[in-house]
């Protein structure tokens, strides 16, 4: 077991601390890459057990974070993202249990073939190495990222937001003790031990080759900064400007249920719907949909056609179509059928998650095929944009790019591959 790195208040020693942290993580990554699945699963079981046993400690630490955040006047949606309840801590532990049950991807031969000269070539899954995860208000990311990286054989450096520092520290202690119980390096999951914001810039630099990939989890400004400054590859999504399109062939009751859930289940998550598109051929659905949303406490900002259906709708401006509210607000617009919906999403979407509600499978197929988003849904809520709902146990983020990983980034997406070649003495002519 290595000596813990001490937290510091100033930045004078920060570069040295961060480089030491990366070196220890790299050494741990070499051990994890060869660790058997059974040993990793023992660590995960111990982590789950400790999080359940220390739920009160975690919630007490979180209460201090929440009180501090409220004192500086953050938004209700921010408080919701920051808050840990007994149910959310239990869900965190449940997620670890699911990850434990996921097949270990490391060492899996995904393809194998024999060449005419007799050589056998295998494509094999391998860990990425050291992953840096930078996140803001959600303390559960510490657990999700830690266990996913462990299962996939990667070491991880966690840099949580200053708002969730106490919560993350309490969660991290459970993870580290789980590693120790299983005989794995406790530096396999490292929490940056300072709130100093300069740590983010150092992590983005790659720490002299100590970090292989960065995953940001947070708002638009954080992700934009990461993508602009990172000197290593990034798995990132910008905002979730997600749409629900209610087609002319939609069942009204189904549409109401899906729209309400997509917007109001949890308004502060990246899978929340931010724009409602309604087929001009089904304008009779506008009034009941708007009435339902306003009745649930959601502000509706609409175009002229939507405002004509309900005087309580406020005017939408051009910025509304591009806004991730993360709040009880939705923009609403009438479009000319599925083609109009697709055109609007192409112009204003963020390639995250978009849904269609329709009983016409042909129209649904067109939407699913032509909308260029990481997740597209037919007759289901956008709030299913979550690794746990995909059966991944948890997710380290939802990637909206097209390289390496796209959609929920789970265990399998945190691996790369290498080629193993078996010969019998072949030489190249």
Swiss-Prot record:
UniProt keywords, alphabetically: Amino-acid biosynthesis, Cytoplasm, NADP, Oxidoreductase, Proline biosynthesis
Reactions catalysed: L-glutamate 5-semialdehyde + phosphate + NADP(+) = L-glutamyl 5-phosphate + NADPH + H(+)
EC number(s) given by UniProt: 1.2.1.41
Pfam families: Aldedh
GO cellular component: cytoplasm
Classification via PROSITE patterns: PROA
Any one GO BP annotation for this protein: L-proline biosynthetic process
GO MF term list: glutamate-5-semialdehyde dehydrogenase activity; NADP binding
Pathway entry: Amino-acid biosynthesis; L-proline biosynthesis; L-glutamate 5-semialdehyde from L-glutamate: step 2/2
Entries under CDD domains matching the protein: ALDH_F18-19_ProA-GPR
Keyword NADP: yes
Compartment(s) of residence: Cytoplasm
Predominant location: cytoplasm
NCBIfam families: PRK00197.1, proA
UniProt xrefs under HAMAP family: ProA (MF_00412)
Protein's job: Catalyzes the NADPH-dependent reduction of L-glutamate 5-phosphate into L-glutamate 5-semialdehyde and phosphate. The product spontaneously undergoes cyclization to form 1-pyrroline-5-carboxylate.
Protein family per UniProt: Belongs to the gamma-glutamyl phosphate reductase family.
Protein known as: Gamma-glutamyl phosphate reductase
Gene designation per UniProt: proA
């Amino acid at each position: 077991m290595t000596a813990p790195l001490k937290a510091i208040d100033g930045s004078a020693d920060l570069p040295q601390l961060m480089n030491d942290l990366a070196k220890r993580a790299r050494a741990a990554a070499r051990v994890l890459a060869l660790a058997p699945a059974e040993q990793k699963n023992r660590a995960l079981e111990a982590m789950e057990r400790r999080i359940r046993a220390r739920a009160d400690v975690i919630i007490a630490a979180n209460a201090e974070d929440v009180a501090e955040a409220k004192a500086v006047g953050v938004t209700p949606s921010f408080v919701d993202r920051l808050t840990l309840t007994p149910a959310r801590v239990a869900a965190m532990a449940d997620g670890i249990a699911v990850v434990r049950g996921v097949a270990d991807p490391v060492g899996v031969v995904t393809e194998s073939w024999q060449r005419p000269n007799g050589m056998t070539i295998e494509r094999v899954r391998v860990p990425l190495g050291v992953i840096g995860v930078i996140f803001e208000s959600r303390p559960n990311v510490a657990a999700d990222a830690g266990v996913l990286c462990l299962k996939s054989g990667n070491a991880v450096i966690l840099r949580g937001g200053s708002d969730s520092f106490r919560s993350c520290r309490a969660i991290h202690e459970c993870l580290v003790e789980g590693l120790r119980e299983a005989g794995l390096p406790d530096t396999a999951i490292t929490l940056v031990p300072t709130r100093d914001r300069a740590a983010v810039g150092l992590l983005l630099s790659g720490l002299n080759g100590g970090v292989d990939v960065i995953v940001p989890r947070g708002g638009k400004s954080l992700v934009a900064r990461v993508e602009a400054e990172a000197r290593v590859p990034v798995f990132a999504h910008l905002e979730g400007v997600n749409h629900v399109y209610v087609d002319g062939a939609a069942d009204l009751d189904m549409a109401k249920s899906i729209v309400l859930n997509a917007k109001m289940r949890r308004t502060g998550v990246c899978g929340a719907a931010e724009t409602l598109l309604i087929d001009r051929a089904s304008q009779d659905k506008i009034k009941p949909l708007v009435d339902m949303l306003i009745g649930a406490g959601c502000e509706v900002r609409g175009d002229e056609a939507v405002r004509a259906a309900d005087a309580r709708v406020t005017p939408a401006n051009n910025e509304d179509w591009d806004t991730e509210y993360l709040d009880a607000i939705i923009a609403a617009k009438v479009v000319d059928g599925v083609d109009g919906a697709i055109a609007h999403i192409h112009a204003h979407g963020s390639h995250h998650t978009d849904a269609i509600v329709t009983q016409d499978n042909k129209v649904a197929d067109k939407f699913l095929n032509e909308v260029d988003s990481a997740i597209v849904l037919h007759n289901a809520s956008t709030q299913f944009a979550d690794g746990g709902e995909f059966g991944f146990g948890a997710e380290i983020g939802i990637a909206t790019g097209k390289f390496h990983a796209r959609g929920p980034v789970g265990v399998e997406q945190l691996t790369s591959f290498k080629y193993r070649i078996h010969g019998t003495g072949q030489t190249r002519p």
